[in-house]
Amino acid sequence: KGVSNATINEIYKQIKKTNLTDTNIADIMQLEKDIDIDLCIARRDIADLYEYCLACGKKVYLISDMYYKLQDIKHLLDKCGVTIPDDEHIWISCEKKCDKVSGSIWKEYSELVGKDIKCLHIGDNKTGDVENPAKYGIDSYYIMSAKDMLMNSSMAELASHVNTVSDSICLGLVISKLFNSPFALCSTNGKVSYDDSEIYG
């Protein structure tokens, strides 16, 4: 509370006020990072589009509202098999101290990068990734997150049966497979279909 665009270290500094030891804090913070790295999965259609744009010589920026710092983000990208761009092409809210949801990061982007050029942003948050960029003349393309795809699919009822952390993890693993592609529901009117036996299993 009271910490805007905080880094993970700043967040855990606040948690330390609950009288946890430095060792406890370090262990819990590392556990959070390890779990995120283990569970993080690239959305292949979007990752492939990103790689294609790089191959075509396009300037691509990765912009995220996130409490992980640059090295952690690069570790996540590497784990997911995504080409890591130069540091200046990764904008993270906790390091920039401005963000997508408030729109402040788009103001800076439009002044430093997007001036007098055509830009397209792709994201899954209607406010931070669509409405706010538009205020600064930045075009956007909205894709649904896997969670939003679930809630707009024929399997939406599953969400009401999530009662525990284990349930949440299991559902996350399911939707990461079913809705890895943000276009998975485009031709089915929201009905979930299985293209191969691995996904069905």
Please name every model-derived segment.
Residues 1, 149-165:
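Conserved phosphoryl-transfer catalytic core
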Residues 5-61:
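Short, acidic loop-to-helix structural element flanking the phosphoryl-transfer center
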Residues 42, 68-71, 97-100, 127-130, ...:
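Flexible loop/turn segments at secondary-structure boundaries
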Residues 61-118:
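Substrate-recognition "cap/lid" segment bordering the active-site pocket of phosphatases
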Residues 122, 127-155:
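Acidic, Mg2+-coordinating phosphoryl-transfer loop and its flanking beta/alpha structural elements
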Residues 191-201:
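Non-catalytic interaction/regulatory modules that flank or connect domains
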